[in-house]
Amino acid sequence: MPIAMVMAEASARHGVEILCIGTELLLGNILNSNARWLAEELAALGLPHYRQTVVGDNVERLKESVLEAVDRSRILITTGGLGPTPDDLTTETLAAAFDTPLEERPELWFEIQAKLTAGGSISAISNRKQALFPRGAEILPNPSGTAPGMIWCPRPGFTVLTFPGVPSEMKQMWSQTAVPWLRQHGGLADIFVSRLLRFTGIAESTLAEEVADLLEQGNPTVAPYAGLGEVKLRITARGATVEQARQLLDPVDAALRHRTGLFCYGSDDESLASVVLDLLRQRGETVVVAESCTGGGVGAALAAVPRASEVFLGGVIAYSNAIKQALLGISTDLLHQHGAVSDPVVRAMAEGARQRLGADWSIAVSGVAGPGGGTHAKPVGLVHIAVAGPHGCDASPVQFGVRRGRLAIQELSVVRSLDQLRRLLLDGS
């Protein structure tokens, strides 16, 4: 039966189900980021998504999960289990569940061998199973790997889309092949346009109060998502055309930005670091870092952005007092009088880095990340941040709290320091 006809009969079932396959996921050895990413993508497309399941590399339990999905969902999306090893069982289990023979796709096997050869690997006989698919399945090409997926309608009203477990491969296949297919066959009568606004320095509850009326409206919808150091609002508009959907979305976007001011730092794939670097690039200015408790986290965030070298010159990880003295010029008296975690020292770190490394701006961070090392006067979670620029130095202490843990305190310090520089740049300092 043609795929389009099968999807037309899908009204008996509801929604999309995600099935993530892999014992490493079940045991918690690997974070299941695929399910979260796919859920956001489905929401952006306007496809109802009601269930997520994780199952290990076990034929019977995988088969049971698939057959359960048949009765309640019209689309099943699977990730994982498409590799060449014996515990990669997805394709053959799906075929067995619906009593459908596997057929080799010779052109696909040739392509897999070519990819392995180009990558300096020798194709093994085990890789040949990656060219086996149930009769009638449509191939989902994998541009980056040797594990293609498929779109298959084994029963009327039920479609399976399979993807490899490698997130980068799955995302590329989803965007290039699956989304166009879903728009054509997935029952999407309307076009959905989505935009993600990013906020920092404001709590989710406070943000929700500021935009409460917009959160309650129907089209576009506005949904909040909280993360470490930031809050996101996803705006999703529905229209007969892309242009119509954007006409609905843009005024809500503008209203949200107007109400929240500097708390909104960017949208979609923008990061705080990329926004800061763009602002510096527009001004023709440079930045360096001097880090203690963050251990290079601020520099790493900046260096992760393409073209960062145009404005990010480098930095110093001054963890010990001796390094602070030798590389940043911090005086012994200042350290003895105030301690490394203090306003005077972090200011001196920022000014020392800016002058010695020859940049327009510098960020300095010093704090108590824990779990030990805190005192009554300087508890775990206390972080001093300073940003030095052409017209002076702006410094402030932040108390992130002992309960957050070391890594969270470090990450929050990175976010806060980048945001401090962003605000100064926008202020015209």
UniProtKB/Swiss-Prot annotation:
InterPro entries: CinA (IPR050101), CinA-like_C (IPR036653), CinA_C (IPR008136), CinA_KH (IPR041424), Competence-induced_CinA (IPR008135), MoaB/Mog-like_dom_sf (IPR036425), MoaB/Mog_dom (IPR001453). Pfam families: CinA, CinA_KH, MoCF_biosynth. SUPFAM superfamilies: CinA-like (SSF142433), Molybdenum cofactor biosynthesis proteins (SSF53218). Belongs to the CinA family. This is CinA-like protein. It comes from Prochlorococcus marinus (strain MIT 9313).
